[in-house]
Amino acid sequence: ALDPVKGPSRVEVVFFEPEKFTDVKDAYMGSDKGRDATLELLKDYLTTRGVRGLLPGQKLAITLTDVDLAGDFEPWRGGQWGDVRIVKDIYPPRISLAFRLTDAAGAVVNEGKRDLRDMAFMMKLTMGFRDDPLRHEKALLDDWLSAEFRSAKKP
């Protein structure tokens, strides 16, 4: 939705074929509704955080092409454990995306494709997200945003 105070968003996030994403399930069997809710949370997060690295007039378009949430379901544990996401270092968060950064005139400043993965995600402190089920994915996106767009703020 358009915020009348801020105007149109400077960060656009879209998902390419989300039904084919590796793992965005909220339960072992998952549902379209659960997947869409999870992706909407990631979209909101990227829309909010992505603006921080932009210079005035710049716009950022991000297309997520795959998401594999940290952890996995281990149904062989049996019973009620079938729908519990088990987070271990062997199941790192992974996100594949394409992006395009444009200036106020619409000229492309930077663009590319990135395959993000954090094999050390279990070793990091994610204090701001401690109770957030997407804390590892959000930390991965924060790392990418700060590394990719840190130079955009420098004169």
Outline where the language-model segments fall:
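A structural "domain/chain start" motif
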Residues: A1-E40, Q58
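A short, structured loop/turn motif at beta-sheet edges
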Residues: V5, R52-L60, R100-E111
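N-terminal post-signal-peptidase region of extra-cytosolic proteins
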Residues: L39-R49, R77-I86
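Sec/Tat-exported extracytoplasmic proteins
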Residues: L42-L54, G71, W144-K153
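Surface-exposed short loop/turn segments
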Residues: L64-T102
